[in-house]
UniProtKB/Swiss-Prot annotation:
Positions where N5-methylglutamine occurs in the chain: 153
Gene responsible for this protein: rplC
Pfam families: Ribosomal_L3 (PF00297)
Organism encoding this protein: Shewanella frigidimarina (strain NCIMB 400)
Domain of life: Bacteria
Database matches in SUPFAM superfamilies: Translation proteins
Record carries keyword rRNA-binding: yes
Transmembrane domains' residue ranges: none
Entry GO terms, CC: cytosolic large ribosomal subunit
Protein name, entry field: Large ribosomal subunit protein uL3
Family that this chain belongs to: Belongs to the universal ribosomal protein uL3 family.
Complex and partners: Part of the 50S ribosomal subunit. Forms a cluster with proteins L14 and L19.
Amino acid sequence: MAIGLIGRKVGMTRIFTEDGTSIPVTVIEIAGNRVTQVKTLETDGYRALQVTTGTKKANRITKAEAGHFAKGGVEAGRGLWEMRLADGEGEGIEVGAEINVDIFADTVKVDVTGQSKGKGFQGGVKRWNFRTQDMTHGNSLAHRSNGSIGQNQTPGRVFKGKKMSGHMGAEQVTTQNLHVVRVDAERNLLLVRGAVPGATNGDLIIKPAVKA
């Protein structure tokens, strides 16, 4: 897996090309990602980089977190994220190093992972795009009902994974192959074409596209 960065969704806007074409873009702020730990095959059984970004109030940091950050000589951030490394990736990156948005300077497309907006408890029509039942013709109570959820004595149960009403959203979602429109290293900004998962100010993981 390629090295990615942790960013924050600022919001959406649009930019214009020289010929006047309007391009909808999402602005992602990628402050310096500080390496807090480098995991190796010898010590951990796999290769990975653990990073943090941003800041966190001192009274919100646990003793375990404080010790972990102090061991790496890194300022405490708002969280910890880990990215697996393939053979040959991340060579020369040490604890305390800072990775910035300019690593995407030559990247054409990226995959963006975030937590989708939570929508609470929803029915089958909204959650799974079920078709509604008749509004009339004798139907007076079950317009948006899910309908049958199984059979009879055989199998005598509801199969796991059956699409039913329940909590919708607030889950990890990845949008693939978003075109990189602009990299602003001076202001730590990355502009990608289109929308990305999650609400404004939500954390995002940005990696070079695997299917590009």
